[in-house]
Amino acid sequence: MLLQYIQSPKLLSFIHVINRFYRSNFYILFIGLLTVLSEIFGWELPVYYLYVILGGVIPLFFCEDMISIIAPFSFGYFTVSLKHQNVNEGVGVTLFTSEFMIHLWILIALIALCFITRFIFDYKKGKRIHASKNMLGFLILALTFITGGLFTEKYGIHSVLFGLGVVASFAIPYFSAYFLVDFEKEKKDYFARVLVGAGFVLIAEVLFAYFSHFDAILDGTFSGEMVRTGWGVKNNVGAMMVFTLPAPIYLALKHKRPFFYLGLNLLFFLSTMICQSRNAALVAVIGEMILLVYFFIKTKYRLLSLVTILFFVLLFVACAFLFSNLVSKMFDSLIWTLQNFSIEILASGRFDVYQCALDNFKTSPIFGTSFIEEPVGIGAPPDYFLTDIIPARYHDTYLQLLSSTGIIGLIGYLYHRYVTLVPFFQHKTSEKWLYFFEILVMIGVSVFDCHFFNIGPGIIYGLALCHLDQVNQIDQKERYLFSFEKAMN
């Protein structure tokens, strides 16, 4: 913001260094390091202050845009430490004490002030914002969510707030990036690099979870339930890991030597398996096959890429063989699931919950029964919603929509899905494929779980939608200018 008023060459040179830093891998890695430290040591509050200073305050005064918000948005969900989780008392987080909430509201006010100030400044400089069809999609989705359970006894402010919160989880990062990031200056691979950074953050946190229970691994009592962080259990961590799979494939196609990124993709795939989430594993297997087919169709280095994949596969197999006793103890439940695979095992006794969702839908097919109607089999206490904010759910996004919001909510979701996919089909590019795969991941992980209603997936999803929209607008503009120049010549 102060860039245009500075005349000193030395100071201008320093500010240009700051701008390059925010677009570099070093910034992404630094935010990732802060995130891991927060999750391991319980340093959420100081890390949040650093997030706001680095992502909002400094860029407000010294940067061309606020690309600095992409990494903190993407990693912020992973900061909550297990130290602040009431593991012995059931679901609930002790992080949000009254003292912490005072700091949190200060931080929210500060970052909101930075965002609004930047938006006004950019607008006065002449920046114009083009309307997006996603804006209408978000509005319709929000309206259908807040009417979920209308005319039923469970309908109330808690259900309304939860519905708005779901839409806000991807609308806030979407609009923040949409209004504050200059996508014409953003390198096309920037978001992919952020997703790779997210992959490393998740791997570090999963490894910490394993090492925290190393005694259980050695004595054979380790289970997938021990793969948990302060912000989620194995299903949450596994789902977020799946979101990182497309990025290395995109980067492999963008670089002349794709072999490093192929290795990263396989590492992220293996890490998804290590999370021991059956839902995430299923989506990862299907998604990985689709990604590799896409890669081999597009790449010029098919033979070398195949050799690279075989090398990493053999490396993983050799490591598993060398440490077979340890591996069998760590993944006993996952190995058993693979050996005895069936839909019933995959669903993990959720059919009663699914039937409950269908029964609720039948009782109120138009507006549903609200988000706070408790599913059978969850075992949530009466005050579950008030103590944990997020209500018990049906482990299936689409049944959740029918049960909680009825036909109206399903229509709102389908319209939202339509407008999110339209930009992809308008002149496909490699960047659009990346964001399209991110949307497919959200659809996939939501089949046997409710990740569409979770904050972390919502943030990545919202940023992917924003990038898809902006890339489409830039692509249309470039093709129009090319056609115009061609016609003039």
Model-derived segments and spans:
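Aromatic-anchored transmembrane helix interface
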Residues: L104-A109, K133-I146, Y155-F179
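Loop-to-helix entry and N-terminal half of a specific, functionally important transmembrane alpha helix
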Residues: L195, F260, L264, A392, ...
